[in-house]
Amino acid sequence: MEKKSLLILGTASHVGKSSVVTAICRILSRSYRVAPFKAQNMSLNSWITKDGKEIGIAQAIQAKAAGTEPTADMNPVLLKPKGDCVSQVVLLGEPYADKSAGQYYDSIEEMHAVLKGALERLWKEHDIIVMEGAGGAAEINLYERDIVNVGTARLTKAPIILVGDIERGGVFASLYGTIALLPEDVRKNVKGFIINKFRGDIEILRPGLKQLEDKTGIPVLGVLPHFKLRIPSEDSVSLGDKEDSKAEKEIEVAVIRLPRISNFTDFEPLEGLVKVRYVDINEELGNPDAIMIPGTKNTVNDLLDLRASGMDKKIQAFKGKVPIFGICGGYQMLGRTIFDSGVENGVEAEFEGLGLLDIGTRFGEYKKRTVQVTKKVNGYGPILRPIDGEEIKGYEIHMGVTDSNRTVFGDDGAIDEDGFVIGTYLHGLFDNRNIRNALVRYLYEKKGLEYEPDEAISENDAYEELANVVEQNIDMEKLFEIAGV
């Protein structure tokens, strides 16, 4: 069987590679068995597969758009920054080691072998693999050690489409410059350009498109308009686009922007219903209607930073006044104590938590729990009482064990005696419509406002919406020809 593949590279981070791959996966899935692939992903937003493997959330979304089950082979190397130039390396969905950049690059040959195995397994089960690069493709200082851009291109010999973002300016220079800097053996496989996030009259753009084509000999396949994506974000680069979102809403939820924040996508389902404001630990907390403490790649260090900034006292002052939620590392911080045997911070020590929940957490070994779960709501307190006994789904990605005397979702989490401080290990909590509506309804009614339960767009509708935008603005016949389908 012919090993068909298509590689989507970008001129920089956050130009739209992930969304383009998602759309192409959706479109091709109508006629072919499609798998997404990203050799190496650096992200703190991750997903747990059905068999308990951890991959980047973007590849999970792309797999769902393609109508296939997410697997670890779709993102064989996941790098999760921990700070101080060290990342946790997750290999085929399992924690492998904490490595500095230099240590990681020393093991690059081992990574190449992992990629080859993953690709071979995907090709056995699928007709075509739609692959995604990372950041900018023309990182000339990394060519000999790269596995995700030039490395993937050389490994697969795949036809390449290069994506540029016009919103930030300089798109023609970035596309032309990337082509000029790519090695010749990779450059010759670039078969098309896509310009993303355009606002305005496309006729004004056409002279530039023609000049770009004339100078490079590469066709522009289309120009995608700027539009609101209704699928989760991949990385913290996009957090900057959220800070003033939904300013017209009367209800404000403050998400503490921890220095090592992870899985901030947990709060995206709230954005259409309330103003979600991401608050740096050195900023004023203001007067929010609810507070969220998110996950983190290092609970202990972020707790220490929270305390050094004085944000801990600001959060504690809201106990009993507004709902306070902690998810994963945020849940651990809400407790009385955290004992670290050296797993988190390198030395054995006990740390005082925020003291808002009667729990204690222990980091005893370098072992991560990764699992998809279904739980029942223990409807204690005014927020959760209306949905007592209802089911919710989520996934866990955490180290450490927490002891709780008053659980909140089955055997998970904790809730205080008033029902206003809630902690859980469950990522994807607010993806559950019942939880989302229970919280937002409470916040609205507390302010004397009428709330109509949201009818969130389904995942499938979101994928179709994205695919339709791409189909309407891209030369799909040419794209199919490039992909060989």
UniProtKB/Swiss-Prot annotation:
Role description: Catalyzes amidations at positions B, D, E, and G on adenosylcobyrinic A,C-diamide. NH(2) groups are provided by glutamine, and one molecule of ATP is hydrogenolyzed for each amidation.
Keyword Cytoplasm on entry: no
Gene: cobQ
GO MF annotation list: ABC-type vitamin B12 transporter activity; catalytic activity
Annotated keywords: Cobalamin biosynthesis, Glutamine amidotransferase
Span of domain GATase cobBQ-type: 250-435
Any one of the GO BP annotations: cobalamin biosynthetic process
Pathway recorded for this protein: Cofactor biosynthesis; adenosylcobalamin biosynthesis
InterPro entries: Class_I_gatase-like (IPR029062), CobQ/CobB/MinD/ParA_Nub-bd_dom (IPR002586), CobQ_GATase1 (IPR033949), CobQ_N (IPR047045), CobQ_synth (IPR004459), GATase_3 (IPR011698), P-loop_NTPase (IPR027417)
Superkingdom per UniProt: Archaea
Protein name per UniProt: Probable cobyric acid synthase
Sections of the chain in a coiled coil: none
Entry annotation: catalytic residues: 328, 427
Sequence similarity: Belongs to the CobB/CobQ family. CobQ subfamily.
Secreted keyword on record: no
Pfam families documented for this protein: CbiA, GATase_3
Lineage, opening ranks: Archaea, Methanobacteriati, Methanobacteriota, Stenosarchaea group, Methanomicrobia
